[in-house]
């Protein structure tokens, strides 16, 4: 059963170094630091922020951004790491799967999250 669907859009230019420290998990910061240009760094952080805001809409409760880690498969497909999924279902109850998607278009990053309860 679908528990929640969330969508968020972020203007990439809103991202600055101060919010990056609040938005990204430790693992995400390590990946962020490997990018050379500011444009790519901002796009990366904006996409992660949009995912985390989408998850807040799914669960209808605030989630500390740094508790959630968004990674990418070899194919580029984004996913939540296992610890993040476990954290969310332990904190808010239930058991299931979380699907996410991120897209970038010009100055925007948009993300969608779908939480499916299997209980």
Swiss-Prot record:
EC annotation from Swiss-Prot or TrEMBL: 2.7.8.7
GO MF annotations in UniProt: holo-[acyl-carrier-protein] synthase activity; magnesium ion binding
Primary location group: cytoplasm
Biological process, per Gene Ontology: fatty acid biosynthetic process
Residues annotated as binding Mg(2+): 8, 53
Transferase is among the record's keywords: yes
Enzymatic reactions: apo-[ACP] + CoA = holo-[ACP] + adenosine 3',5'-bisphosphate + H(+)
Cofactor(s) demanded: Mg(2+)
Cellular localization per UniProt: Cytoplasm
Family under the similarity heading: Belongs to the P-Pant transferase superfamily. AcpS family.
Function: Transfers the 4'-phosphopantetheine moiety from coenzyme A to a Ser of acyl-carrier-protein.
UniProt-recorded name of the protein: Holo-[acyl-carrier-protein] synthase
């Amino acid at each position: 059963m679908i528990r929640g669907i969330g969508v968020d859009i972020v203007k990439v230019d809103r991202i600055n170094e101060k919010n990056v420290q609040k938005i990204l998990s430790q693992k995400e910061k390590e990946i962020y630091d490997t990018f050379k240009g500011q444009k790519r760094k901002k796009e990366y952080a904006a996409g992660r922020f949009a995912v985390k805001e989408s998850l807040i809409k799914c669960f209808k409760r605030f989630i500390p951004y740094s508790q959630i880690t968004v990674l990418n498969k070899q194919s580029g497909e984004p996913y939540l790491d296992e610890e993040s999924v476990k954290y969310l279902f332990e904190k808010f109850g239930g058991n299931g799967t979380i699907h996410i998607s991120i897209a970038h278009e010009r100055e925007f990053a948009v993300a969608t999250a779908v939480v499916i309860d299997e209980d």
